[in-house]
Amino acid sequence: MKSSKKDIFILHIWLKLMGCYVFMFITSVVLPIAAMFPNLGFPCYYNTLVDYSKLNLREKNQAQHLTPTLFLEAPEMFFYVTYSFIVDCCSLVYYALAAVAVVKAKKHAPGLMALSQWIMAVGSPTLLYMAVLKLWTIQLYIHTLSYKHIYLAAFVYCLHWLLSMVYTECYITNVSSQWTSSELKKTIPENILLYRVVHVLKPIMMNVHLSVVALETLIFCLSFMMAIGNSFYVMVSDIVFGAINLYLILPIIWYFVTEFWLSKYLPRQFGFYFGVLVASIILILPVVRYDKIFVAAQIHRAVSINIAMIPLCALVALLVRACRVYTDRKKIAYTALPSKPQTIKYTKPIEPSTKQAPDSSIFLEEESDTDFEQ
């Protein structure tokens, strides 16, 4: 069936936003590579924020210069930037394949509004716009780190983290109720490319994005607490504990959000838990690398215990999610009634439920006559 003018307009907007996404991705890949060379306008190497060998956990911040607190060093920051852009590249391939699938599926549209519904199932124009903003904010973050503006960097990354959280939630829920999201997927014919994109490729991309969200939550906690530590006259050790405990609390909140809401849309959500496990390894590296500094400050054991609680909570949440996925398999899912009513054929004649004796009517007539005579 031919699509409506509204659906054609949404398709054109969606394809144009995809072109903007491709352009922004190219600039986002070029920027961190160019930022590694000082002669291209970047004053400092963004991966190395401060000299963490001068970390002193027993002192308070100094207003004259940047006080080093717990943050990622060059190898960890390089891993995060590389992994996030690899995921963005996979997302670009996903959207490109989805665009081809939607254009090819136009001739299979069963109704006037089917095309816009399929675009919503793949990723709405609003979702693409948020993806463009995500790439733009990560570019700003690299710029601000290169100029050592930690306050502006913390603010920019806060925006990036919030965009990433909202993007992931909208990506999973399709910005609709559970019933509507399920019905959107049911309208796609099974024998076309779009069906495989929505039902196979999209859940994989969701889990990959969730792993990136876990790493971005760690960067947000460290950036936010570094800005706090250089804004107030506090102990550096308090900032270290604050960053670790903040990263312990935020994933726990996400675990509850997953179990009570997001799992209804995507039961097999395991990417965030694996991302938290990788982030906890990244977080423990400074403790191992600067073991003497933490031991001298007498907070080595407390920091190690707090960091160890992060993967422990992630493993417990992962076990709960796996158990719920296994138990939900045994539940009977709702299925719609058949469109055509089924006819029932009886092979035997229907027997009456109550039987009456052949002479019962005679007795009734006699009783009525005697009553009348009296």
Curated annotation (Swiss-Prot):
Membrane topology classification: Multi-pass membrane protein
Residue ranges, Intravirion side: 1-16, 104-117, 171-207, 260-269, 323-374
Which residues, by range, are in coiled-coil regions?
Answer: none
Q: Which domain of life is it from?
A: Viruses
Q: Keyword Glycoprotein on this protein?
A: yes
Note the InterPro entries from the entry: Herpes_glycop_M
Q: Where in the cell is it found?
A: Virion membrane; Host Golgi apparatus, Host trans-Golgi network; Host endosome membrane; Host nucleus inner membrane
Which residues face the membrane's Virion surface side?
38-82, 139-149, 229-238, 291-301
In terms of one coarse class, where is the protein primarily found?
virion
Keywords from the named record:
Disulfide bond, Glycoprotein, Host endosome, Host Golgi apparatus, Host membrane, Host nucleus, Membrane, Transmembrane, Transmembrane helix, Viral envelope protein, Virion
Q: Where is there biased composition of kind Acidic residues?
A: 364-374
Note down the stretches annotated as region Disordered: 345-374
Segments spanning the bilayer are 17-37, 83-103, 118-138, 150-170, 208-228, 239-259, 270-290, 302-322
Does the entry feature the keyword Zinc, yes or no? no
**What's in the GO CC field?**
host cell endosome membrane; host cell Golgi apparatus; host cell nuclear inner membrane; membrane; viral envelope; virion membrane
Q: Which Pfam families match?
A: Herpes_glycop
Complexes and interactors: Interacts (via N-terminus) with gN (via N-terminus). The gM-gN heterodimer forms the gCII complex.
Record's family? Belongs to the herpesviridae glycoprotein M family.
Chain's role: Envelope glycoprotein important for virion assembly and egress. Plays a role in the correct incorporation of gH-gL into virion membrane. Directs the glycoprotein N (gN) to the host trans-Golgi network.
Domain notes for this protein: The highly charged and proline-rich cytoplasmic tail might interact with the virion tegument.
> What is the protein named?
Envelope glycoprotein M
Organism, as annotated: Alcelaphine herpesvirus 1 (strain C500)
